[in-house]
Amino acid sequence: MSSQSSPISLTNNDLEISSNNNKPIIKQLPVPTNEIEKPVIQNIVATVELDCTINLQDVVRRVRNAEYNPKRFGALIIRITNPKTTALVFHSGKLVVTGGKTVDDSRLAGRKYARILQRLGYNVKFNHFKIQNVVASCDMKFAISLKELIQLAPKITKYEPEIFPGVVYRLADPKMVLLIFASGKIVFTGGKEIEQINKAFSEIYKILLQVANNDN
């Protein structure tokens, strides 16, 4: 799995919008494509199986940057600064790594956390490393009519402005959830691979061109 985003290029095919007579038309771009902010990874959540039960009370006494409050949460929290990440360690031996900006950083952080526990005498392994969620964000640099967006795709959108200011958009392929704001900002969640973020961006870009709010 690649740890870097592949470049996204937008061609005329990406900008085609079907008209009523089924002939594609090209909608005038709200802003030049080179001004649009491509998705940037904000957080990667990964899991690892250590295949070893962990005495969390023992670890919190012996590791400096560790926190454990079983009344509030059933996992031990450890933080490291390089790469800057946070780990949740469960008694069962499950390790959750959050805060990574690349897959390689997440894997490296996971190995460092495993090493910390190994130095304490735990016979840990590093098995089944898996990316569970990739969160990214971008700015389209043009305003979006959220009302038009939910009219365009009523079955896969949810908009409750009194509760949340953005549209929740459920993309089918790739299967992800996007949070879309009137300002043009988008948050991508639920991706399992970096490539899915890029594909989701290309898909939503074509849709948002149809609901660009040129009045703002």
From Swiss-Prot:
The keyword Amino-acid biosynthesis does not apply. CDD domains: TBP_eukaryotes. Keywords: DNA-binding, Nucleus, Repeat, Transcription, Transcription regulation. Its main location: nucleus. Pfam families: TBP. Gene3D superfamilies: TATA-Binding Protein. InterPro entries: TBP, TBP_CS, TBP_dom_sf, TBP_eukaryotic. GO terms for cellular component: transcription factor TFIID complex. It is found in: Nucleus. The keyword Transcription applies. Belongs to the TBP family. TATA box-binding transcription factor. Members of the TBP family are differentially required to regulate transcription and development during early embryogenesis. This is TATA-box-binding protein-like 1. The gene is trf1.
